[in-house]
Swiss-Prot record:
<dbReference type="GO" id="GO:0016740">
    <property type="term" value="F:transferase activity"/>
</dbReference>
<comment type="function">
    <text>Overproduction of CaiE stimulates the activity of CaiB and CaiD.</text>
</comment>
<feature type="compositionally biased region" description="Polar residues">
    <location>
        <begin position="187"/>
        <end position="196"/>
    </location>
</feature>
<keyword id="KW-0677">Repeat</keyword>
<keyword id="KW-0808">Transferase</keyword>
<dbReference type="InterPro" id="IPR050484">
    <property type="entry name" value="Transf_Hexapept/Carb_Anhydrase"/>
</dbReference>
<feature type="region of interest" description="Disordered">
    <location>
        <begin position="173"/>
        <end position="196"/>
    </location>
</feature>
<comment type="similarity">
    <text>Belongs to the transferase hexapeptide repeat family.</text>
</comment>
<dbReference type="InterPro" id="IPR023446">
    <property type="entry name" value="CaiE"/>
</dbReference>
<dbReference type="InterPro" id="IPR011004">
    <property type="entry name" value="Trimer_LpxA-like_sf"/>
</dbReference>
<comment type="pathway">
    <text>Amine and polyamine metabolism; carnitine metabolism.</text>
</comment>
<dbReference type="InterPro" id="IPR001451">
    <property type="entry name" value="Hexapep"/>
</dbReference>
<dbReference type="Pfam" id="PF00132">
    <property type="entry name" value="Hexapep"/>
</dbReference>
<protein>
    <recommendedName>
        <fullName>Carnitine operon protein CaiE</fullName>
    </recommendedName>
</protein>
<dbReference type="GO" id="GO:0009437">
    <property type="term" value="P:carnitine metabolic process"/>
</dbReference>
Length: 196
């Protein structure tokens, strides 16, 4: 794992969290219990404090950064999709930020909200609870349905379970030269399926 002290501040990672070895955590970063930090994620706490609360996930290639004297926060059970950028913002409890979305400084995403993939949330945006946000710039298009929130929570549970699975079995290896016969398929831990 790539952890770096910066001006005397050392990242804090709860022992039950999983941080992929290729992720980079610098300086003032606080990672809570059961958090998943994916491959190539960059959490740069060299200006403002970065806080990832319990049960949240920061997926592959995500970037977190912020200005001095501000906290960039992912709330409890927050779900940050592949390639998203969070800069000086607050993601509410149980909210989802879709793949490759950008959330700018001072923006607040409300609890149980969903930001659609590829959305751009402008600086200073203040969302409400349970909004579906989409577009460039993003705007609230409607409320998140019970089914959508259930789907989000199943996906987050998959990542919470992945923490333990990674601690138990993820290790560096060499590739096989060919696929073995009857190669098994990986199974999830919930009945989540892609949203169509």
């Amino acid at each position: 794992m790539s952890y770096y002290a910066f001006e005397g501040l050392i990242p804090v990672v709860h022992p039950t969290a999983f941080v992929h070895p290729s992720a980079v955590l610098i300086g003032d970063v606080i990672v809570g219990a059961g958090v998943y930090i994916g491959p190539l994620a960059s959490l740069r706490g060299d200006y403002g404090r970065l806080i990832v609360q319990a049960g949240a996930n920061i997926q592959d290639g995500c970037i977190m950064h912020g200005y001095c004297d501000t906290d960039t926060i992912v709330g409890e059970n927050g779900h940050i999709g592949h390639g998203a950028i969070l800069h000086g913002c607050v993601i509410g409890r149980d909210a989802l930020v879709g793949m490759n979305s950008v959330i700018m400084d001072g923006a607040v995403i409300g609890e149980e909200s969903i930001v659609a993939a590829m959305s751009f949330v402008k600086a200073g945006f203040h969302g409400e609870k349970r909004q579906l946000l989409m577009g460039t710039p993003a705007r609230a298009v409607r409320s998140v349905s019970d089914d959508e929130l259930h789907w989000k929570r199943l996906n987050t549970k998959e990542y919470q379970d992945l923490v333990g699975r990674c601690h138990a079995s993820l290790h560096e290896t060499q590739p096989l030269r060919q696929m073995e016969e009857n190669r098994p398929r990986l199974q999830g831990t919930t009945d989540v399926t892609p949203k169509r």
